[in-house]
Amino acid sequence: MVENQSYYEWLKNQPAQYQDEVLGKTRAKLFRDGGMTVERFRALQLDKHFTPLTLEQMRALEPKAFDKAFAAVVKLDNTKDRVLAVKRTDWGDLPNVMIAHAKDTITTHKHYQKAKSGELSSALFLVDEYLTDDFVLKLHHTIKGYDNVRIVPVHAEEQLGRNKIPMAYALALSEMLGVDMDLGIVQAKRAYRTSSDGVGRLLKRVSFDGVVLSGHHYMIVDDVITQGGTLADLRGFIESKGGKVILASTLNGKPNSAKLPITKATLGQLRKQAGKEIEQWWQEQFGYDFSQFTESEARYLAKQIHRYGIDAIRDILFASRP
């Protein structure tokens, strides 16, 4: 690299194949065609090794630009030792989760494990593989009527390392939709849901922290949806702080997981099977009742009660509370 030459300028002079490998094909095309400005490139918040900078590093490198870009959305605060309540809000008119690839799993893809364990370049390759123009167009039509839209990825630390797929997915959507990505909302408590069974997923709530811009519209994204608990927890945090979640999207998931709001029929069936004791216990433990379960969470719990009996499930829940 030439002395005093920026990484942006240096990368501009590299072969297209190298740019594709570093940025991914979609971003590299924007980069070459002039669609990715220096400001947008910096907004990726990556160093020359394509590793996310810490907030402290970003502030040290360009304090004025950092304060201008993040003063409203980033709170430099240590949440590690604080216990943050998990909130959920009424479902309202939230549409189904939009899933980019629902035909089969992405876990067998050659880049999946590296992306899941913290390699952003692998995550970007993975996103490029499954994100289509037609799907992005559907997202565009869904959000085009809203102003002040921000994309928030789930920051999830799994046991293999820090999962980069949600961030890569958010980066791609941010550029293709022309919507700002917001990294100021962070997961404050690890859940390790990837290796959890259904009951474990129900009990391991995810808390978030950060600054929500009241009155703004949010699109929340994750890599995969199973029961939808993480998205529900993130939505609850944002809406309890004055934001409005207009859409949730994941790169992968089964079609039957796409419906987040619990239906009246499923809620009625769950309450009939579980009785008042378990719902009251849940309300005391987590601060919300069965009406704020996702459809998949409720169906799973009802299925387990039917299979093993209410007494067995009550014992499992009460004994398994983290």
Regions found by a protein language model. Give the residues of each.
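PRPP-dependent phosphoribosyltransferase catalytic core
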Residues: 74-104, 235-322
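Acidic, low-complexity, intrinsically disordered interaction modules
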Residues: 23, 28-61
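A contiguous pocket-lining binding segment that forms or flanks enzyme active sites
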Residues: 217-241, 247-248
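Short connector loops at secondary-structure junctions
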Residues: 181-196
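Active-site-facing substrate-recognition patch
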Residues: 74-148, 192-212, 287, 301
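Short glycine-rich phosphate-binding loop at a beta-alpha junction
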Residues: 147-158
